[in-house]
Amino acid sequence: MKLHELYPAEGSRKVRNRVGRGAATGNGKTSGRGQKGQKARSGGKVRPGFEGGQLPLFRRLPKRGFTNINRKEFAVVNLEQLNRFEEGTEVTPELLIETGVVKNAKAGIKVLGNGSLEKKLTVKAHNFSASAAEAIDAKGGAHEVI
């Protein structure tokens, strides 16, 4: 094989379809937009949820609830994720971020009781579920709210 014999693999290169370049191309005249109407015009599209003038579903349904501006969103850590640490380790939010258990601490870290804990650990976090706190203490470890 020589340099002048190299060619791209079959099907790896596709020619861009240029519209509005003559009837023989199959995409001339109306450029694949069909005949007249809103969708044939420049910038012609209907907004999401538009139902042709009929009162749309999102306006037919009643408003519900509100957004609590004081809501704190915690980064969640489950008990089973804490098993990666050595026995007797003091698990802090900084350590959880450093080891990649948590990517973003958000408003703090909450430990939940999913899975089982097999090691005695001292866990420091911003919040604990009742089952998580109970499981940590049952293994002889300690939990501390910071």
From Swiss-Prot:
Physiological role: Binds to the 23S rRNA.
Ranges for region Disordered: 1-55
Pfam families on file: Ribosomal_L27A
GO biological process: translation
Name of this chain's protein: Large ribosomal subunit protein uL15
Keywords: Ribonucleoprotein, Ribosomal protein, RNA-binding, rRNA-binding
GO cellular component terms, semicolon-separated: cytosolic large ribosomal subunit
Assembly and oligomerization: Part of the 50S ribosomal subunit.
Annotated TM spans: none
Biased composition (Basic and acidic residues): 1-13
MF (Gene Ontology): rRNA binding; structural constituent of ribosome
Domain of life: Bacteria
Biased composition (Gly residues): 23-35
InterPro entries: Ribosomal_uL15 (IPR030878), Ribosomal_uL15/eL18 (IPR021131), Ribosomal_uL15/eL18_sf (IPR036227), Ribosomal_uL15_bac-type (IPR005749), Ribosomal_uL15_CS (IPR001196)
HAMAP family: Ribosomal_uL15
